[in-house]
Design a protein with these regions (language model features):
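Glycine-rich phosphate-binding active-site loops on the catalytic face of alpha/beta enzymes
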Residues: 31-44, 88-98, 152-162, 216-247
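Conserved anion-binding
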Residues: 38-42, 57-80, 84-196
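Conserved, mostly hydrophobic/aromatic
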Residues: 26, 87, 153, 184, ...
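A C-terminal functional module that forms or caps the active site or interfaces directly
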Residues: 200-218, 229-232
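Basic, often amphipathic N-terminal segments
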Residues: 2-60
Length: 264
């Protein structure tokens, strides 16, 4: 059972950071995990991201890298090239009926990564339905399947249709994340209690709700992407560009929640 009654420092994790200058600012602000994304297996070698990862390695922060593709051969190449602290897999696990045999390819990939790159930690996104929707995926069962080959779990929001049926309309087809929608915190709290590895709370986490998320779910860390993005002149969110004032507020709220829990 894992419930962080006596909590150490809560991990702060920010995605999607693709440039060294942005990473430098996040390090100065005090972000613990700084995540980048490789969006194409045809164009996976990106010197700016490599420089970003290398610069993070020289600090107390850790780099995390998401590959938005599944070919083991290409994933091994990017791990060789970038050498991140963490590789983060965020496949949509919701359409495999929660049967272990249906996840053998993904489990095999994670086992192989652990064998070939023992210095790289593995983060696995676990889908949780959007707040207010009927549970359509067995989050806890999925976590039990992947826990032996993972170092961290990250909760993320699975978009479902209004009928509560699963939908393929995730922002990136075949993967979960960057929805800007809050996941069901009751399920996330159950995952924290049942998991023997650290759980990072993600899914619509912002400076406005992160305090409540931490004090209710009691995760080991919190992750923000969409809600800490910059906005254009029309108020639209800009992917791959961060709003550093939002992130400063985010960090301040995290440390306040951390203090609240540790002194309760």
């Amino acid at each position: 059972m894992r419930l962080n009654v006596e909590m150490a420092k809560i991990i702060t994790q920010i995605y999607e950071v693709q440039k060294p200058a942005e990473a430098k600012q996040l390090i100065e602000i005090g972000v613990d995990h700084i995540g980048s994304v490789i969006v194409s297996e045809d164009n996976w070698k990106i010197p700016l991201i490599k420089e970003t990862v290398e610069n993070i390695k020289e600090t107390a922060s850790k780099s995390s890298l998401i590959p938005l593709f599944k070919k083991q051969e290409i994933i091994f190449k990017i791990l060789d090239y970038y050498s991140p602290d963490i590789v983060h897999f965020c496949d949509d696990l919701s359409n495999h009926n929660n049967v272990k045999e249906n996840y053998e390819d993904l489990l095999h990939l994670q086992k192989n990564v652990k064998e070939k790159f023992p210095e790289i930690m593995i983060m696995r996104s676990i889908p949780i339905v959007q707040s207010g929707r009927t549970e359509t995926v067995s989050t806890i069962k999925l976590a039990q399947i992947f826990e032996p080959v993972s170092d961290f779990f990250l909760t993320d929001t699975l978009l479902t249709a209004k009928s509560n049926a699963s939908t393929d309309q995730q922002p990136v087809n075949g993967f979960i994340g960057i929805t800007g929608k809050t996941c069901d915190w009751d399920i996330a709290r159950k995952l924290v209690k049942s998991s023997s590895i650290p759980v990072i709370l993600a899914g619509g986490i912002s400076p406005d709700n992160v305090f409540d998320g931490i004090t209710y779910v009691r995760p080991s860390g919190v992750d923000s992407c969409t809600a800490t993005n910059a906005k254009d002149e029309n108020g639209g969110l800009i992917r791959f560009k961060k709003d550093f004032e939002k992130i400063k507020r985010f960090i301040k709220k995290v440390r306040s929640a951390e203090k609240e829990i540790n002194t309760a």
